[in-house]
Amino acid sequence: MAKKKAFIPFFYFTSIVFLPWLISLCCNKSLKTWITTWWNTRQCETFLNDIQEKSVLEKFIQLEDLFQLDEMIKEYPETDLQQFRLGIHKETIQFIKIHNEYRIHTILHFSTNLISFVILSGYSFWGKEKLFILNSWVQEFLYNLSDTIKAFSILLLTDLCIGFHSPHGWELMIGYIYKDFGFAHYEQILSGLVSTFPVILDTIFKYWIFRYLNRISPSLVVIYHAIND
């Protein structure tokens, strides 16, 4: 009976780990058709206007200067000119389809992550008792560790999060989150987040050492500073 009670929180923790993946798989299959139909029927006209006025024009302006393109067209025979215009038309349609699929992909991933967050929040709320048991296990495990191992673990964690090489890890993590939500890659936003998060975490960590660790385990703070130096 005791083993069964101990197994329930472990099963609950395992379900929390794998539940987001299962929700994402089910939502992607069930929502993709509905979102695609809704986007193509309700948003098609607005989307095409946006693409024609911005993305398509910007792409072709970058590919070929308008003046050089005009001079090249004047030298073309009528048959080649028709083929040239047909090629531009096909490329424009293909470009619009790609951006249309990208918008659908963005909405699908954002909706899936939002649904996953709501379900996990409710799942965690109704399983507060099991989370309390898991928390007590973690606290007991940490309490049984020696101060040296605790200090080494804290130092390793802080070096990973706010150390010299941490911006590369933050860049990969934030980039993955952007991709998971279906957002485009913006270098300025990414650089701002990468340069801000480690500073905020460093400040919080120093405050935590000053207010919490100094009070409950002064020896741990001494060992940590000795290893860090």
Swiss-Prot record:
It is found in: Plastid, Chloroplast inner membrane. Coiled coil: none annotated. It is a multi-pass membrane protein. One of its GO terms (cellular component) is chloroplast inner membrane. GO terms for molecular function: antiporter activity; proton transmembrane transporter activity. InterPro entries: CemA. Disulfide bonds: none annotated. Belongs to the CemA family. This is Potassium/proton antiporter CemA. The lineage of its organism: Eukaryota, Viridiplantae, Streptophyta, Embryophyta, Tracheophyta.
